[in-house]
Every structure is written in structure tokens, then in C-alpha cells.
Amino acid sequence: MSRPNTRNKNKRQRPDAVDSSSQILRKIHEANDVTDDDINQLFMIWKPVCQGCRVNTRDNPNCFCGLVPPLNGSRKSGLWQKTSEIIQSLGPDPTLDRRDSESTPAGLTNLGATCYANSILQCLYMNTAFREGVFSVEVHVLKQNPVLDQIARLFAQLHASQKSFVDSDAFVKTLELDNGVQQDTHEFLTLLLSLLERCLLHSGVKAKTIVQDLFSGSVSHVTTCSKCGRDSEASSKMEDFYALELNVKGLKSLDASLNDYLSLEQLNGDNQYFCGSCNARVDATRCIKLRTLPPVITFQLKRCIFLPKTTAKKKITSSFSFPQVLDMGSRLAESSQNKLTYDLSAVLIHKGSAVNSGHYVAHIKDEKTGLWWEFDDEHVSELGKRPCNEASSSTPQSESNGTASSGNITDGIQSGSSDCRSAIKSEVFSSSDAYMLMYSLRCDKQENQEGQKENPIDITKGEVKQLKGGYLPKHLSEWINNMNAVFLESCKQYNLRKEKELNALTERRQEVRTILSEAAVQSLEEQYFWISTDWLRLWADTTLPPALDNTPLLCSHGKVHASKVNCMKRISELAWIKLESKFNGGPKLGKGDYCRDCLMDGARMVVSSDSYRDRRTFMKSIANDVLSGKCEDGMYYISRAWLQQWIKRKNLDAPTEADAGPTNAITCNHGELMPEQAPGAKRVVVPENFWSFLFEDALKVMSEDTLDCTCFPVDSSQCCHCTEVLSEVACFEDSLRTLKVKQRQNHEKLATGKGIPLTPQSRYFLLPSPWLVQWRIYINMTGKNSSSAPEPERLDGVINTLKCKKHTRLLERLPELVCRRGSYFQKNPSTDKLTIIPELDWKYFCDEWGGLMENGISAFIEVGNTDQSSSPDVIDLEKDSSPDDNMDVDAQQLILRASPEICEECIGERESCELMQKLSYSEGDVFVCFVRGKEAPKAMLEASDSSFEVDRRTSKRSRRTNYGNLTSLKVSATTTVYQLKMMIWELLGVMKENQELHKGSKVIDQESATLADMNIFPGDRLWVRDTEMHEHRDIADELCEKKPGAQDIEEGFRGTLLTGNISSEAC
């Protein structure tokens, strides 16, 4: 049982509309009248109104499906695209940048690599005392100090701006920071506080010392003599600090790092201390002692270490724990009566494994609410009651005045010393990315009965405005209010434009759906109008459609043409009135506006086409008989090739341009019959009736610039001029064929490319190999294309190019010889620039190609002893056979001499220029093979010594060897060896320090040298071995932490206001 045909089961079976239209037109032609039924059939008016087609049907004027998407659908563009995409065309939405609430902090924009500055600025701003100190700076001081003015404005925006983030561009430009280079947060904090301290010197008492009062502490470096017990004179000197730098390597907690920072260092041996009291070098101890602590203490965790082996910096990513509450009373050198209990207030985090890259974020505690916030540039998110997402534990902290506890942490509980009088239970947080810690001194309660905190800096009511529990000076308040007003106005205007756009969009969509629902004409008797489908699609899919345009539907008489039925739709009178009244245009094409004249002309053409098609079918049968040789009553010549193409063409209703010129191919330039021996001039004889049909069609379609269709009866004579030319060509080809045969006989071995055995004491001549190749192609080409092969140049000119003009000596090196089975041959005749030929062949060449016997470059082979001194034109024999074959030449050598001799001076100059050009490549491929083992195979060493041809294409199979695959690398002459090794590291996984790179037997180890310096050319094959001497590391470390060279010196904040020696007026 055969399978049912289901290939077309889902395709709509369309009636043969063309045949039915032709029948109607034939009927109109016979009746010479057009009826309403004919109009209904020709214009497809009879077709039903569609109800939900997948796409719009072109041949049904009553189909309005697919002009708009379904109710919940959308399109990629136009009126029906998604609402969100239309809103995007309005531009950025400023309401998205609005701050969620007054209690939510604002972020700072990242200008490229300014996350380090953003983190520090947020930490300073979130400190209430410092923020209010900045706000208290007098106006005249701000005008004299641009840095103070910009930080005050920045804090004012963070404090009261309606935007969720603040642009820090003005502050960064004022400091002259490079926003494309990431810097260290600790260095930035120290330099910024120092700069602000200088800028505040001319401020009032309230803010003059705010930096020192909040962030500055003091330490002293104490050296104690172990013999007399006295401290050195320098031990009494105190140094100020903004942050304590603590070691992290090998330490797991803040408590351990503080112990390490304050630990005793023994000075003994070669490191003994010279005691002034003892007047001798003695053993001593040295330590750091904390003298005073600031209200805000900052710990810088030294996560960056220097690796001597790689001369690079590396980040320590081990986990580090720190407590929520820190007791520093026991750490002071002198006991204090005040409690020195600090609460964790900020954690700066550096994300990333490299030192010179990555990203800084800050976790900061809100002093008022106690909630922690994450500040990630523009994005600010609430963290809750804990700063870090990593695990934490509860531990008691010692409050005793003795040494701080440093016991082990077990099950989350830290065991304190037995001297502890009380303990503060505190959470301990841990982080592998924490880079800086800030602790704030816990003060006694300073709240009044109303529960509001007292303002620590006295500011008069006339100078400030209270916002969110904070204070803004009047000038900053007015400035920020104006800025907020502009921002809120932009939000308002955007919302108005958005609302207007959406309302217009909804109204327009509803209009389209309403009119399309009323467009269908329900019966044949109703009045209807024609409308262009293209305009209807445009109207239904654009927000602002153009004026109504029905002109594409009109014929030359200004009526509706029946051929446009696929380009128009039939709509109701109600729909037409709505469209015409709103979009104007036209013309108005109603029920009776069809063109009767065009219909009658179309009917006549259909009848005429039927007659032409029948005649052409009959003529095709005659043409087939002509080509098969069955036609005996031929009277005229036509082109055989043209007739073959004519038969293959479809049976059309009227002649086309292809029917012109049935005799053009057999007509010569003189207008006569071309000889049949000419290319493409084959002809056939056709009957008179067939010729008349073809001639009639040719005249109908022939254009003015086309040649006349020449008639050639069978008794026409061939063109005598063309016949004579063809005869001359035939004679020339015969003589050329004879000449080539003779040259092949004279030079049998050279013509076939066979090797010519060489004998000592015989005379030979040297020919340029390119000339010999061209000659071989010329004499071996036969057949129709033999005369098209270019002739070789005359020998005199070719030989002269081989001699230098200055010394008239040979400009090419002599070819090498090889011994094979007792005979001597030229080693590489296919690649050598010169080819050795016998004397007889040179004599024949001189006679055939215009050479002079005495002008040739002669060569002869001599047998000499190995101890004889060789001249520059001597080529040693290369033994390419077994030892048994060369027993008679062990103590002697073959010497190839040339006359004239080779010119070493000119050849050296030319080779130097060629080498310089070859080493100036901008792009090329070198091939690298990874070799396992101590030595490379011999094949690799030989392959490495030779280079690939630059333009030669090689397959993958040809590059595959028994020692592995070659890896292709794109390089240039200026590529350094360091860059090449980095490419090898990336592709083969061999670390740069472990690469032993070779070209042949030569080691390539100068990383700063270029490939041109090392004579590495495109196509060279290199090999590399892994020494495994150094421990493996990630290539990302090398890319991010490459050694600073002359062009990569770390400049830090050099060139900015942070390091400039400026006066306070210029701050």
C-alpha cells in the first residue's frame, strides 16, 4: 500500500485565476460587452469576507486580516510595537533616577575608574560630625578654596538631592584626578585628609580642626636598651597618623594583627642598637606605642605583597575576621580614664584577584538608624544589621586595662584572659576582600528629653535649614533647592509627554481597529470604494500616516485597472467617508469606476496571444526537424546555436527581445555570410515559412540600435575577405606547430623537465629558471590555444639582466650539485634561480631565440682536493647517496665554476635590501610546536631552519608531523618576544618563565627584542619546551600585574592637587 501524499495538505488550493480571467476576457471579446458578472469575476468581488486568516490574502479584495495584530499582540516596529519600546523613544526617564525616600542614601557616579574615591567620600559623608563640620565652613572660605567648595556641594547633594545618585565629575576635575586610572583607597584618604586639613586653616574655630579632631591619632617608635633599660631620645617623639597599617599575611583576625603591630622587635647581632647612655652597641627592643587615638580610627589591611621572583604584586585573599565592637583601652601606652570602646562603622571592600584592577565598594553603618548600607557607585542597597554577607559569630571582648585577649576561637566563643573584669559580647565578621576598616568611638548618650541628638557644632538658625535631621547652610540650601526644582520639573515634563504619547497611541490604535471592523462590504448590491492596499497597510501600522493615495491603482485613462486587483481592497462607504474626511487625498474610486477601454484591449490581447502561441507551437516542431536533419526543403540559413536556444525558451504569448537576430552570429563584419569554419558560425537550413515567422518576430522586437536581421538564402556566398583571413590563420598555426615540434626535438630533456646528468670537465651554460619555465609552457601548448601562449623574451636581454652593470659579473648564486647513484645532478632545479643546461642546448637556443654564443654564462665542473682553497664561485658537492656510491670522491670535491664569476659585492647589497624588506612585514603567521622531552626531533630542527614561503598555502595535513601539530600565531615584525611568549602561554598553557623557545637550534630568550631583531620571518617554524622550573600561575596575574617598565611607572596621584605644593588659598 502506497503512502498518501501529505506534502501539500496544509497549503491552500488556489484556483487557476489566470485561466479563469482569460476565459472571461475571451467572452468579453466575443460579446463586445462587459457585464456586472464579468466585473465581479475579474475584480474578485465575489470572494467572501475573510474571518481570521493568518496573513492578508492579496487576491481577495474583501480580506482585511493581518493588517493589525491580535488584541494582545505586538510588532517589532510601528504603531503596534510594545508600549515600553515606544516610551524609550522619549529618551531617558528622569523619574527612574529619583531617590526612593529621604532615609535612603544617594550613590555617586563612576566616571571610569573612580570607585576608590566614591567609597572614601561616602565614608566621610556618612560620618555625621565630619559632614556637619564641612557644612559649617564659612562662605568666604569656600570661595577661596575650590576643593572645600566642591566637597561641600557634593555633601549637600548627597544630603538633600532628590536624585538617587550624584554626579562626582566636578569634584574629580577640581582635584585633577585621572578618572581612567584606579588608585589605592588608603593613599587617597590620607592625601585628601591632609589637603582638607590645610584648606581649613583659615576657617572658623568650629571647623578649623575637624580633620585632626576626628581622624588623627599619634604613635611613637620606642627603642629600649636591654642593658640600662633607658629609652632612646627619639622614643619621645610622636608621629600623627590617619590610619594604622596592619599586616594580613599569616594573620586571621584584627586582634592578631594589632598584636603583631604592637609587638616587640629584638635588635641583636648585626642589628644592635647604639645606646648613648651605655656608649656602646647593645641589644635592644623596639616597638610601636599608641599615644592617642582619634574618635574615628581607620585600619588599613595590607593585602598587597611583593613577589621577588616575578617582580610583581599579588593580593592576599585569605579570610580575615574583625569584631563589631573593639576595645582599644588596653592598647594605649598610657591608661586612659575614659572608655575607649569603638563600634564598627565602615568596611571598604576590594573585589577582584589582581592588585591594580578590580572594584571598590563600601559597607557603611547609618549612625542614626544603625542599618548597614552597601555603596556600589550609583547603586545603594540596604544590608540590614550586618555589614558582610559572610558568616559571623558572637565573641566576648576584654574590657580590662591589661593586655587584650588573643585566645583561640572555639565554637564562636573567644576565651579571654583571667584578668578580664567584664566582657562585651560582640559579633565577629569575616571577609576575604575587606581592605579598610573604620571604627567610631562609642560616646555617652547625648540625647535630650525629646530624644533628639544635640548638634555638636553650634550653628545659628539663620544660616541653616534642617533636612532629614541634619543641617544645611543657607547658601547650600538655596543651591540644592534650585537643583531639585529643575530635576522635579524635568520629571514632571517627562510624565506629561509620556501620558500624552500613550493617550495618542491608544486613541490611534482604537481608531484603526474601529475602521477595519466597519470596512467589510457585506453584499454585492451595497455601495463600495476601492483603496490602495499599500496605503492601507501604511495607515494601519504608523502613528502619523500620509494623505490617502489611490494613484497607483489608476490606468492611463484615470480609471481602475483590472490588473491592480491584487493591490487594492474593497471597503464600505462608511469606512471610506471616515478615511477621506481625516486624511483627504484620493482619487475617489467607486463601484463603477472600472476602465472599460482597458478591459476591451485586454480581451483583444488574450485572443491575439492564443493565436501566436498556437503558431509558435507549430514552428517548434519544424525547428526540431531542422536540428535532427529531417527537413529537406530548406531555403534560408540561420545560426544553429541561436535556434537551439530558441527551442528551449517557453511558449510565450508574444515575441521577446531574445527573438531578435537569428542570423547575427553568422553575419561577419562586412555584412556577408561568415565562413562556417569561423568560431561560433555553425548554421542550419530552415524552410521558407519558418524563416518568415522568425523574421516577422525579429522585426517586432528589434530596437533602433540593433543590427538588421540579414537574410541569407542557401545560394549565398561566403565572405571572401573572412575566408582569406581564416586561411592565413590556418597557415600560421601550421608553421607554429612545426616550429614547436622541432624545438621539442632539439631540447628533449629540457622540454620534459627531466634531470640532466652532469660530468666533470664538460662545458655547460646557465639560464634563468623563470625563462626556461616560460619557454617550456610555450612549446608544450598545443591545440586551439597554442597561438595564445606568450613567447619568451629574447635571450640577449635576459642574459644581460643576470650581470651587474658595475662589474659585469654574475648577480645570482650558483646552484648546488648532488650525487645520486654515481651520477651528478643539479640539486633543486625547480627552486634554483639558475638552471644548468648542456652546451648543445645553449647553441640551439641562440639560433632559435636570438642569443649570442659568446655572451652566455658558461660553467664547468672541476674535480679538486679538499685542502684546496675555494673561491667564492665554488660550490661543494652534497652527497645524497649511500657511502658505497661515493667511494671515489671521498678525498676530492666537485667545483662548479662560472664565467663571468659571481659578484659578491652586488649580491651582498641586494640580499641586505631583501632581508630588510622581508623583516618589515606588518602581518604574518609563525608556527609553534610544543615539544615534550629534553630535545626536539631532528625533523623539527631541520624544519625550523627553513621558512615557509609567505604566499604558499599549506594544508593542515601538510603541517601535521609525528611530533605534534603546529599552532599558527598572527605576528608582525615589531612583535616582541615577550608578546610572542604571552601568545604561546595563552594557546599552549606553558607559563612564560618556563618557556624554552627555539628557532632551529637557536634559543630565543631576549624578551625585549622584536621578531625582526631575532630574524624570525613569516612562515618560520619555532618549537617550545616546558622547563617546569617555576610554579604554575594564572595568566591573568601576568596581564594585570605586568612589571612596570619605562612606560608603565606607577605615578599614583602625581600631577593632582592631592600632591601639589599649593597654598591654602588654592585648595
From Swiss-Prot:
Tissues expressing this chain: Expressed in seedlings, roots, stems, leaves and inflorescences.
Recorded GO CC terms: nucleolus
EC number, as in UniProt: 3.4.19.12
Catalysed transformations (reactions): Thiol-dependent hydrolysis of ester, thioester, amide, peptide and isopeptide bonds formed by the C-terminal Gly of ubiquitin (a 76-residue protein attached to proteins as an intracellular targeting signal)
Annotated compartments: Nucleus
Residue ranges annotated for the USP domain, each copy included: 106-442
Active-site residues from the entry: 115, 359
GO molecular function per UniProt: cysteine-type deubiquitinase activity; cysteine-type endopeptidase activity
DUSP domain: residues covered: 503-595, 610-711, 738-861
Enzyme class: hydrolase
Task performed by this protein: Recognizes and hydrolyzes the peptide bond at the C-terminal Gly of ubiquitin. Involved in the processing of poly-ubiquitin precursors as well as that of ubiquitinated proteins. Deubiquitinates H2BK143ub1 of histone H2B.
Record protein name field: Ubiquitin carboxyl-terminal hydrolase 26
Lineage, highest ranks first: Eukaryota, Viridiplantae, Streptophyta, Embryophyta, Tracheophyta
Gene: UBP26
